[in-house]
Amino acid sequence: AIELGKLSLWLNVIHKDMETPFFANRLTVGNAVIGAWLKVYNKDEVYGIKGRNNKLEQNKWWERAPHRIKFYSNRVNRSINEVYHFLLPDNNMLGVRSITEQKKANKEAYDRMTTILKSWTASINAADFATLQRISAKIDVLLKDYFTAQISIDKYTNNRKEIWDGIDHAESDSIFKEEERMESYARKQQLFDTRYGHDNAYHKLKLVMDYWCALWFWEYKDAGDLPTREEYWGDIEALLAVDNSKIDSRTQQALERAGASSLFDHEDDFSRISEDDAQIVLKTQKEILTEAHANISLFANEEPLRLQIVERLAERYHFFHPMLEFIEVFWLRDGFDVICGNPPWLKYTF
């Protein structure tokens, strides 16, 4: 689908002496209705509600719509009181449980899924929320790293000639400077393909989002490998592989003072990452390529079975995460100007 898209665009823009346009970083494919977003829940929406005898009861976050995060020019605009929605399981996951015929044939697996699902949606306590804060902060680190790499790649793969204004930009301080021009289309493709490296921020973030999506489609045959909520968080944190020292100072202080509830009872400037913590510095071509070959695999030994299941389901259902795939569009422009969709149609009546 991507190759056909490239060909169609080439045929529509081709002209004499033009440089071969590079569309790989503009086109992607997947199931647009199955994916995760860069959206968050506030603490009040997920933290357990005090019931009788001060016992924490469920705060049904899955019945609320998460809020989309915003971006400043050089940072994710997320409060320490907000955690990413794809870190939290949903009461409607494990959809296979609703198929009556399969339920009867897989009674033991069904019972295990039911037990696991109940534990997934248990109340969130202080320790749980601190874990969610820490993981969310690590996701921010990788989002910034991925965005930096993406705009760097965009810079190096842009066509070196402007068509419309007829101005030679080679002498200006822009993306068209001579030393930044790519030697060949193959070189551009090589740079872009670094995003699929095992240790690349994009690859890690996509696998985390795929993991959340996979829990909706988990099959009875794999019921024995379903993670508990704590195992799910542990798997994600291991995937991200971000040292605690790299998370922003605001979150570090919040985690250190997790016992001081007053810190989380309100939101102010202190709860958001500062400009000094989040400067964007573009990467050179050499840095991009070197980092891509730093690690062949995320894991020292064989890839965990649960993640093999996640990758199998992702390949089958083509999970698609729009804000991740087009992060520079959402970061710099807050989304697309126009979105064209396929059926089902809504028939207008007058």
Pin down the residues of each PLM region.
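SAM-dependent methyltransferase catalytic region
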Residues: 1-350
